[in-house]
Amino acid sequence: HTHIESSLLTPLNYAKLVVPHGTLTVLEDAHEIANVCGEEGLKYMLESNGNIPMRQLLTIPSCVPSVPNLENSGATFDYSLYRTYLEKDYVVGLGEVMDYEGVLCSDERITKILDEAKNKKVYIQGHAPLLQGNRLSAYLCNGIKSDHEARGVQEESKSIDKVLWIDIRDANTNHNMPKIIEALSEIGNL
């Protein structure tokens, strides 16, 4: 999972840098470019696929804007846009469902977007930092399959009980991968 546009590189130049290190496929969530450029940014990322030396699988950003009424964005994606884009080549699912409060409150906009993804039977990626217990269960009941925002050992073990795919990451802002892997291995059945 990556946001190529956050590297400030075009998909081609990004590929030129990562392919020599063995990265041949990335799961691109075009969230940033979609929030700034709207549908044109999304089209750009899709169209770049045939011209780069790696495979770029895309998830269509679920939250444009990230959280309605809380921030301004260059675009607003209506649920009808997903009907078309979730069927495009190289598209494998719906990107980070960040508006977890909207999901939990059955907000009409995010509910319709999730319904489109479920109707298309695509992967739905979660983004639910620190969501636990009944709130996590309610979030997952909407077809969300993973969370790439899990940050702590306690959080990871509680998520496992909910049958949630956990994306463990090591990034410049998050260096706890060894601790999380150790804690998860103690749970067993991994």
Please name every model-derived segment.
Residues 1-15:
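Di-metal (Zn2+ and/or Mg2+/Mn2+) metal-binding site signature of metallo-dependent hydrolases
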Residues 76-96, 102-168, 172-190:
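Histidine/acidic residue-rich metal-binding segments in metalloenzymes
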Residues 15-123, 188:
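Divalent-metal coordination cores built from histidine and acidic residues
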Residues 1-3, 21, 31, 127, ...:
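Histidine (H) residue identity feature
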Residues 1-5, 58-65, 129-130, 137:
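Short N-terminal helix-initiation segments at or just after the protein's N-terminus
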Residues 7-9, 34-37, 173-174:
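Acidic-and-aromatic substrate-binding clefts and catalytic sites of carbohydrate-active enzymes
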